[in-house]
């Protein structure tokens, strides 16, 4: 993170939920990438969103920070069950997941740890790690053309092709239809949970990644882990005007 207000707020938020921050790198050479959606309260008490405000780095990650990131990843690996990678910075090499770091992630995945990746524009460049694209990202990564939103069958085809490309499992999210789990041998559709009422899908992909990660590290198989990802996302999308979270009690409640 940068030595800025956004980095400070992020660290405070992590501490508040009990997350460790001792391995985080703080540097005055970078900004903390931040995506903000200002809200305006209407007369009826409802909130409406204004245009998004983004804070980004416009120059490549310094080499010394890359070196430290890679060193810390290697040290931390021994004490964790899995690694979740969120590569949301679109500008190449301007975020934490640079080309060098991505190569190191492939090595980590080859050491038997469960590594799960979500990447906004480079999902097809990862190797050995499991990846979690949506249907558009999966199709784009393997060069499959389509008109409009990909169908479930197109998502399956894209997922299988992407699994062969990255050399690992692919979890393709397909909106309200749930998820497709793919490997080189085929695809399994894991239906989503039906949700009624108003929803906000922003962050649903992050929620499903967290659900898959928690389930897989707890020993569930790939299909059951995908089902957990669907379940978590089905809860978080119902949180309007707030950060989408899904507690164990909330997950148990929707399963009753």
Task: Enumerate the language-model features and the residues they cover.
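Short glycine/threonine-rich catalytic loop with a Thr-x-Gly-x-Asp
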Residues: 194-212
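Regular secondary-structure segments
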Residues: 213-217, 234
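Ribokinase/PfkB-type carbohydrate-kinase core domain
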Residues: 1-199, 218-220, 226, 231, ...
